[in-house]
Every structure is written in structure tokens, then in C-alpha cells.
Swiss-Prot record:
This is tRNA pseudouridine synthase B. Belongs to the pseudouridine synthase TruB family. Type 1 subfamily. The keyword Isomerase applies. It comes from Thermobifida fusca (strain YX). HAMAP family: TruB_bact (MF_01080). Signal peptide: none annotated. GO terms for molecular function: RNA binding; tRNA pseudouridine(55) synthase activity. GO terms for biological process: mRNA pseudouridine synthesis; tRNA pseudouridine synthesis. The gene is truB. Responsible for synthesis of pseudouridine from uracil-55 in the psi GC loop of transfer RNAs. Its EC number is 5.4.99.25. It comes from the Bacteria. It holds the Pfam family TruB_N.
Length: 293
């Protein structure tokens, strides 16, 4: 079993757990996990850790994400995406492109966002989606997230027997924990017509891009893993250790602080990745030790 990261281009209709189950079979190990859920409707980058790389996943989940989304204005749904039941329909033919641009600007920066009722957020110890599917009205608290970019890339009017709608294509760069479904819902609400997400593709998680991703069919034909050292060096600053520092780190001991505020990859003189470390109380503390694990 190779330790490392697999960048999967998740197909529509698959849950993130479905992908993990398939990678477990391909890798021949149950020591597999992912670094952040994609909804079944969504496609694109799902970062999967194999072996020792599963210990990276909690840190990779906190990295910046990039999405390409399509939002329909004029319809709201129970799930804030196309998978839910229609709640309300309002004419959107009066909405122009300038109003949409103003709406996306208002949702850019540090914002307080309420997650969708059908989401993995825990409410009193149970996932919100389980409560919602049981018929319970879920009260979710707003959470602070950062939307670095919410750019309109397409604007189309849609006239159908169901009404007059607007479809908006957008690119979103955001912090961990941001729900694109909530952005779609809130953009529609701010414009007074309601909105929901009709398509979503994640194109980047931290440093890992969709251009690097493999489909499940490609992985079945040739299962390739990004080696652990390469995966760490791509995602975090690298610190090269002396032999003495490396010995201390392998045993989980502190070393002198690094010049970085976040996690740093610690590498032995021979190029092996030994650990992730963070500065704590004036020294660099290993928080994940790979050597010997």
C-alpha cells in the first residue's frame, strides 16, 4: 500500500463516501478518507488520503476551495439545490446583470452564512440533514466564512412554461465551511426572487486542481497515488531539518519555532517527510508524526 493523496474527479450522482469506498477497493486498504464532502450533485476535486496521508485530511479540509457554479434565480427549493422540492416560484425577468453583480459583491468578503437545512452540520448531536429528512424544522446558526471571490461569468434569461428565470454562472473562491448552496439561496433572496444551485464543480482544494484529478475509471485502469512527501510539500511550507532535529521530531518532541503561523511540513535530511508541526508556546510542536506511524 502506498501512502499518499489521490485527487479524484468525482462524478455526479456519487456521494463522497461512495468514492472513498471505491478507492479502498482499488488501494487494497480500509485506511482511506477524504478532505471535505462534495454533495452528490456536484462534480470535481475530491482529495482522498490513503494510508498515512489520512492524517493530513483534517488540515487539508481547512484549505481554500474554488468552485464553478450555476444558480437559477426565480425558484427556491427545500435543499437550496436542484435535488430538493420546489418551495416557491417568482418571475425573475426584471432582474438584470448589473443587479446580479451587485448581489454577488454584497456576498463577498467576511460574511455570516446560515448553512442549508439539508447539510452535514450537527444539531444537538445529529446531522442537520437527518433531522430535516425526518420532518423536523432545523434552526441553524449563522457561521462566519470568507468568500474571496464571487464573480459572475455568465448570465442567461430562461423562458419556460414554468416561468421566466435567470441562470447565473459564477466562480467562487472561499474558505473552508462555505456552502455554495447558501450563496445561491442568499443571492436569490437578496434579489427578491429566490434562488437555488443547479450545477456545481469544484476545481481546486488548496493546491490540488481539477487538472491533476483522475476519474474513477482512470484510477481503475491505473491506480496512481501522489506520494506523501510530494502531497505535503504542495500544501504546506517546507522546513528541512538537521539530523538532530529529525531525531527529536520522530519522537514527537518540540524544536525551535518556524517562521510560519500555520502548519509546516518537516522533512528529514534524506527528503522523507517526518511530520506536520505548528508553532505553540514559543516552539514548533509536531501535530502529526508520519515517521513510524
Amino acid at each position: 500500500m502506498a501512502d499518499g493523496v489521490v485527487i479524484v474527479d468525482k462524478p455526479a450522482g456519487w456521494t463522497s463516501h461512495d468514492v472513498v469506498a471505491r478507492v479502498r477497493r482499488l488501494a487494497g486498504t480500509r485506511r482511506v478518507g477524504h478532505a471535505g464532502t462534495l454533495d452528490p450533485m456536484a462534480t470535481g476535486v475530491l482529495v482522498v488520503g490513503v494510508g498515512k496521508a489520512t492524517r493530513l485530511l483534517g488540515y487539508l479540509a481547512l484549505t481554500e476551495k474554488v468552485y464553478e457554479a450555476t444558480i437559477r434565480l426565480g425558484q427556491s427549493t427545500t435543499t437550496d439545490d436542484a435535488e430538493g422540492e420546489l418551495l416557491e416560484r417568482r418571475p425573475a425577468d426584471h432582474i438584470d446583470e448589473a443587479a446580479v453583480h451587485a448581489g454577488t459583491r454584497a456576498l463577498t468578503g467576511v460574511i455570516h452564512q446560515v448553512p442549508p437545512q439539508v447539510s452535514a452540520v450537527k444539531v444537538r448531536g445529529q446531522r442537520a440533514y437527518r433531522r430535516a429528512r425526518a420532518g423536523e424544522t432545523v434552526e441553524l446558526k449563522a457561521r462566519e466564512v470568507t468568500v474571496h471571490e464571487f464573480t459572475v461569468t455568465g448570465f442567461r434569461r430562461v423562458d419556460s412554461p414554468d416561468g421566466a428565470f435567470v441562470d447565473v454562472d459564477a466562480r467562487v473562491t472561499c474558505s473552508s465551511g462555505t456552502y455554495i448552496r447558501s450563496l445561491a439561496r442568499d443571492l436569490g433572496a437578496d434579489l427578491g426572487v429566490g434562488g437555488h444551485l443547479t450545477a456545481l464543480r469544484r476545481t481546486r482544494v488548496g493546491p490540488y486542481t481539477v487538472e491533476q484529478a483522475a476519474t474513477l475509471d482512470e484510477l481503475a485502469a491505473e491506480f496512481t497515488v501522489m506520494p506523501l512527501a510530494e502531497a505535503v510539500a504542495a500544501a504546506f511550507p517546507v522546513r528541512r531539518l538537521s539530523a538532530g532535529e529529525a531525531r527529536r521530531v520522530v519522537h514527537g518532541h518540540r524544536i525551535s519555532p518556524s517562521g510560519h503561523s500555520g502548519p509546516v511540513g518537516l522533512f528529514a535530511p534524506d527528503g522523507r517527510v517526518l511530520a506536520l508541526a505548528e508553532n505553540r508556546s514559543g516552539s514548533s510542536q509536531p501535530v502529526v508524526v508520519f515517521a513510524g506511524s
